[in-house]
């Protein structure tokens, strides 16, 4: 599908869904832009096929079902239920979630699978933090816009009931009660007015009338008044039309379950090319003009429309009221309906049809401010974010309305290779251009020139003009702004051009918010194919300034050349018919310049030699270049009146100003009157006394009616054509020169290599592009260039007998296409340069960030790794080193994550570079160097992080080993306490309770310190990065574990196999010696019992403190046994044995073994160590301590 057809299809679909489209365009286009950019990557064809067409089918199905109960009603809002005037109800893109409140929801059409869509209902979730969405089931579509549907939704909804639906307009997002949306409004409150209207006017369209005033209605219905009642609309411009019926549409009865929308019939009725206004629609309360409204819909029946289509046409120039140059009052063209050949050939958009009144400007004329379509697109961007958008308005006392009735005036969504271009000026179909060509032009005040249309009484035709080919310029078309203030320019900076670049640029994010209103010009160096024709002027101003208006600072402006400009001519002398160029040729092929001496204008005070010279000089520049080379043949008609003396002087001045422009003079008159002409140099003068003699030099078929020839010529139409053509060509030339200079600026040099230079060049390039796109001339062409060209083509169709008109129109068309191509080339060149500069800036920033991370690793990182290397030491030393390393590791991890992100960005940049062509990669040799830098940095980053992780693991392993050994020591001390309590040296048999305690300790040894765990700790120690680290500590823990096991096992064996009493009493002195050798003070009481020595006398203070950290004294545990105060059970057993008189002493050998085992040097016990978590080798729990039942004081032996 070619781009124009794609644009037309998209715009027709949108206009059909959301009429009137001019009212909904800001919102809908904003949503389309966001969806096209986010979901379809700027691919307009995929957007159309995969989303818009299925969405259109679905929405039409919903609309038909909603409208079915109102088949005989006339809707106040023709877009119901999808939109309410300018408020969009069913959205195409998600809204800003921050605007949702409890009880609010909105409906959105979302794409599903390929070429399928569904309607989603979206509202706040229960936590009010996210947006929940739920698809509307297909069976619910027929009842979607009913109160019952929402009640069914609320019955299944857990949160607050939904009651407000969010609608979007150019004013922002607003909640509307669902009851209001589901209750359509109808036009049924003024039936008597409508009936009176139909009786008085029959098939007259309702939208042409203002029903607010009975006097105006009576005046409109007057038979002798030839001005349609639309004049009352212009007269009542000061009133508010908010209570009228905007956008009427008739819903006719169709088949069962189907509603027929007869918009196409209404739209296809073209009132001689005039844009039909909506009935009484205005937004003056919002600062907008009725001329800004769109959407033609008639309240009459289809039969009335057909009757309108069958009415006899009246030529446009017969319907224009005569204008008086002295008093230029308001006038309106009488409108008649014409029906085009077929609705298929004339694709109109309902929403963009405008009313254009033919009205001469007056100094005291007051009009409401009119917003151009540029403002509509600005609002579309603001509405895309769901926020309030201020619409900037321009006062337009006398503006030319650009035609917005065509889809070509809308957004062009271009797929394929031309996406890199900016808005295109591509040709439109002839049928599509026909809607632009039939235009009743408002006079406009532009560039200091006030236009004034003139009637043409000689033009009388009753058949409509055939459609003529037309062109279009992008979708930014509307009213030409006469001036743009700096404040306006700043407001427009982020306007539609950003959207344009995002749609047309190969890289959507490359568009850099280019402005729309600026002050830049350049030298005029475009193709000099045609002179600049006439500018419209007001009759009260005899002359207007030549050239274009001031546009602020220029790049390098040069004068357009020595050719006379139409702006230098007086309007009166130009229209006076004293000289004209009908288009005929003499027999030598030279253009005929007809000079009449009978016109009364020769006597007017404004008809001076200077003015006539300007006129003749300008006319000499009109013919084609090949005809100008032959020179002109001036035919002077002096049959009734001899020429004025000033004519000869004007001819001489013209010949001097434009050398060789006049080659022959054919003087039709008396010979005596031509004597003065003989003085002209290099000019052949032929005096002809009759028309028959003239036929020898000029074929009679080449003579106009004033010389009794059949050659068709209407001077007024010819003047109007060149008055429109000349400023249009001047703008095209200037725009072409500006674009060409900008293209050369972007393509002249390679981007700089350094990051700072690239940043400066990037900023300058953006400023240059912004200045170009803010040029008022270029903006004017974007808004109304296509419409102007279409009007020129329409006017040229009535002047197609003139080869000069045809050549100028062809030149304008070619220049228009050239500007379009230059605009495309400029955007491509700008994108290319900006891409290169952005790549270099990104490379520089990435390199700087990479160097920063690399420097941190080399300096701070390496220093901390070296200073916090794991070493053998006490528990406090290891814990301190571990805590410091954890703080350092947080910094290292942050740097590592930053390095990973930089590596990811570098990889993406490399992938982008690899995806580019060989030529582009060759332009960036630094990409190869950056790739090697990125690989080296990634390797360094990985190595550093692995080293930090390894060192962290070593510290955690060492810390875990210390804590494991500490728990082993506590358990060993508990075993010593147990042995001291049991007094195995004193009794020959151990009670069953003591045996159970020994068994429990063995079970604790097996559960808390199993062999598997001991082996795992050994493997962890062996895995340390430095050989020998922690080995000594591990060996001591292993030996301690073996000692505990052997001690418990021997004690259990001793309790099960007691020794003979004699064996215990054989060598009491030896036990005492052994105990004394261990530093233990053992005393025998009077009853012969062995007392337990105090715990402090076990020699624990003499333990080396290399690995076992000091702890608090164990006084709080109160495990010291005082002499003479043994545990209760042991005392009772001893007393029982004393009572029996069988006192036995322990075996000295066994006592010596127990003493040496129990009284090994032990460190003071510490308080409970807090558990540390987070490491890979964290402690499994608190340190092993004696449980409550094992505590010597809290759990005495009697409790067992």
From Swiss-Prot:
Gene Ontology annotations of biological process type: axon guidance
Low complexity bias locations: 420-435, 1160-1171
Bias-annotated ranges (Basic and acidic residues): 437-448, 1137-1153
GO molecular function: guanyl-nucleotide exchange factor activity
Polar residues bias locations: 518-527, 1175-1200
Region annotated Disordered, chain positions: 282-302, 323-372, 392-491, 510-568, 1056-1200
Source species, domain of life: Eukaryota
InterPro entries: Rho_GEF_signaling-related
A GO-annotated cellular component: cytoplasm
Gene3D superfamilies linked: 1.20.58.60
PANTHER family recorded: RHO GUANINE NUCLEOTIDE EXCHANGE FACTOR-RELATED, RIKEN CDNA D630003M21 GENE
Name recorded for this polypeptide: Uncharacterized protein KIAA1755
Biological source species: Homo sapiens
Gene: KIAA1755
């Amino acid at each position: 599908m070619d781009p124009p057809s794609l644009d037309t299809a998209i715009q027709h679909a949108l206009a059909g869904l959301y009429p009137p489209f001019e009212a909904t365009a800001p919102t809908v286009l904003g949503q389309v832009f966001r969806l096209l950019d986010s979901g379809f990557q700027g691919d307009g064809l995929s957007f159309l096929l995969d989303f818009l067409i299925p969405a259109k089918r679905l929405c039409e199905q919903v609309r038909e079902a909603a409208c079915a109960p109102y088949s005989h009603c006339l809707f106040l809002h023709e877009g119901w239920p999808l939109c309410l005037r300018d408020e969009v109800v069913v959205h195409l893109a998600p809204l800003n979630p921050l605007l949702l409140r409890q009880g609010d929801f909105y409906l959105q059409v979302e794409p599903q699978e390929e070429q399928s869509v569904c309607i989603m209902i979206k509202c706040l979730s229960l936590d009010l933090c996210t947006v929940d969405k739920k698809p509307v089931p297909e069976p619910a579509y027929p009842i979607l816009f009913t109160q019952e549907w929402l009640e069914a939704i609320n019955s299944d909804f857990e949160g607050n009931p939904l009651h407000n639906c969010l609608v979007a307009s150019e004013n922002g997002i607003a909640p509307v009660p669902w009851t209001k949306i589901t209750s359509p409004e109808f036009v049924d409150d003024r039936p008597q007015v409508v009936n009176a209207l139909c009786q008085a006017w029959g098939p007259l369209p309702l939208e042409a009338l203002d029903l607010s005033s009975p006097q105006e209605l009576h005046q409109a219905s007057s038979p002798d008044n030839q001005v349609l009642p639309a004049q009352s609309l212009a007269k009542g411009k000061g009133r508010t039309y908010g209570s009228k019926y905007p956008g009427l549409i008739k819903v006719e009865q169709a088949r069962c379950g189907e509603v027929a929308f007869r918009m196409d019939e209404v739209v296809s009725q073209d009132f001689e090319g005039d844009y039909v206004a909506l009935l009484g629609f205005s937004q003056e309360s919002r600062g907008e003009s009725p001329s800004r409204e769109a959407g033609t819909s008639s309240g009459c029946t289809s039969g009335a429309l057909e009757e309108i289509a069958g009415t006899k046409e009246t030529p446009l120039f017969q319907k224009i009221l005569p204008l008086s140059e002295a008093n230029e009052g308001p006038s309106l063209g009488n409108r008649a309906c014409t029906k085009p050949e077929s609705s298929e050939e004339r694709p109109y958009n309902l929403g963009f049809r405008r009313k254009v009144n033919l009205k001469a400007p007056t100094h005291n004329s007051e009009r409401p401010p009119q917003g151009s379509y540029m403002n509509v697109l600005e609002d579309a961007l603001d509405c895309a974010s769901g926020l309030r958008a201020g619409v900037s308005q321009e006062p337009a006392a006398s503006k030319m309305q650009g035609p917005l009735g065509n889809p070509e005036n809308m957004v062009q969504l271009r797929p394929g290779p031309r996406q890199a271009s900016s808005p295109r000026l591509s040709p439109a179909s002839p049928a599509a251009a026909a809607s632009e060509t039939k235009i009743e032009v408002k006079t406009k005040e532009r560039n200091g020139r006030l236009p004034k249309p003139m009637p043409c009484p000689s033009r009388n035709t009753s058949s409509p003009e055939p459609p003529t080919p037309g062109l279009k310029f992008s979708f930014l078309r509307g009213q030409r702004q006469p001036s743009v203030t700096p404040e306006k320019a700043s407001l427009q900076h982020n306007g539609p051009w950003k959207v344009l670049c995002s749609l047309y640029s190969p890289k959507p994010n490359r568009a850099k918010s280019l402005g729309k209103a600026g002050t830049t010009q350049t030298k005029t160096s475009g193709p000099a194919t045609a002179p600049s024709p006439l500018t419209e002027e007001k009759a009260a101003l005899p002359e207007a300034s030549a050239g274009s208006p001031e546009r602020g600072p220029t790049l390098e402006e040069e004068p357009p050349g020595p050719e006379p400009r139409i702006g230098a001519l007086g309007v009166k002398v130009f229209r006076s018919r004293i000289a004209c160029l009908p288009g005929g040729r003499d027999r030598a092929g030279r253009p005929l310049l007809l000079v009449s001496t009978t016109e009364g204008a020769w006597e007017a005070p404004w008809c001076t030699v200077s003015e006539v010279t300007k006129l003749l000089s300008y006319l000499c520049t009109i013919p084609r270049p090949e005809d100008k080379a032959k020179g002109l043949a001036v035919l002077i008609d002096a049959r009734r009146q001899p020429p004025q003396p000033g004519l000869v002087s004007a001819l001489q001045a013209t010949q001097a100003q434009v050398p060789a422009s006049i080659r022959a003079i054919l003087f039709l008159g008396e010979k005596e009157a031509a004597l003065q002409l003989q003085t002209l140099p290099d000019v052949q003068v032929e005096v002809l006394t009759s028309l028959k003699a003239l036929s020898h030099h000029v074929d009679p078929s080449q003579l106009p009616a004033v010389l009794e020839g059949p050659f068709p010529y209407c001077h007024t139409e010819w003047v109007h054509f060149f008055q429109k053509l000349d400023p249009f060509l001047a703008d095209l030339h200037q725009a072409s020169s500006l674009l060409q200079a900008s293209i050369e600026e972007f393509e002249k040099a390679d981007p700089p290599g350094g990051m700072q230079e690239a940043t400066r060049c990037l900023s300058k390039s953006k400023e240059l592009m912004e200045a170009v796109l803010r040029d008022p001339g270029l903006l004017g062409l974007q808004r109304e260039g296509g419409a102007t060209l279409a009007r020129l083509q329409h006017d040229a169709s009535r002047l197609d007998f003139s080869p000069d008109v045809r050549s100028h129109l062809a030149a304008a068309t070619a220049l228009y296409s050239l500007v379009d191509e230059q605009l495309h080339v400029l955007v491509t060149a700008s994108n290319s340069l900006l891409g290169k500069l952005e790549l270099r800036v990104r490379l520089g920033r990435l390199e700087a960030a990479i160097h920063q991370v690399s420097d941190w690793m080399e300096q701070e990182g390496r220093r901390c790794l070296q200073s916090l290397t794991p070493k053998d030491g006490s528990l406090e030393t290891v814990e301190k080193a571990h805590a410091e390393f954890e703080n350092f590791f947080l910094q290292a991890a942050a740097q590592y994550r930053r390095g990973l992100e930089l590596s990811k960005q570098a990889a993406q940049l490399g992938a982008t570079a690899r995806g580019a062509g060989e030529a582009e990669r060759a332009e960036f040799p630094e990409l190869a160097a950056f790739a090697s830098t990125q690989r080296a940095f990634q390797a360094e980053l990985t190595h550093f992080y692995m080293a930090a992780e390894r060192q962290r693991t070593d510290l955690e392993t060492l810390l875990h080993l210390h804590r494991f050994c500490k728990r082993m020591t506590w358990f060993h001390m508990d075993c010593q306490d147990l042995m001291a309590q049991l007094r195995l040296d004193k009794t020959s048999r151990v009670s069953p309770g003591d045996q159970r305690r020994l068994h429990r300790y063995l079970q604790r040894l097996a559960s808390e310190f199993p062999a598997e765990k001991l082996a795992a700790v050994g493997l962890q120690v062996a895995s340390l990065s430095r050989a020998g680290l922690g080995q000594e500590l591990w060996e001591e823990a292993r030996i301690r574990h073996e000692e505990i096991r052997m001690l418990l096992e021997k004690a259990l064996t001793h309790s099960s196999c007691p020794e003979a009493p004699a064996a215990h009493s054989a060598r009491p002195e030896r036990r005492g010696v052994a105990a004394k050798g261990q530093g233990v003070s053992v005393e025998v009481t009077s009853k012969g019992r062995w007392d337990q020595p105090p715990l402090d006398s076990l020699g624990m203070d003499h333990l080396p403190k290399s690995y076992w950290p000091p702890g608090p004294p164990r006084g709080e545990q109160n495990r010291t046994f005082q002499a003479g105060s043994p545990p209760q059970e042991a005392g009772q057993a001893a007393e029982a044995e004393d009572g029996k008189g069988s006192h036995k002493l322990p075996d000295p050998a066994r006592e010596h073994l127990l003493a040496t085992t129990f009284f090994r040097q032990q460190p003071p016990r510490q308080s409970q160590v807090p558990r540390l978590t987070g490491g890979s080798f964290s402690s499994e729990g608190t340190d092993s301590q004696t449980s409550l039942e094992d505590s010597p004081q809290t759990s005495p032996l009697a409790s067992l």
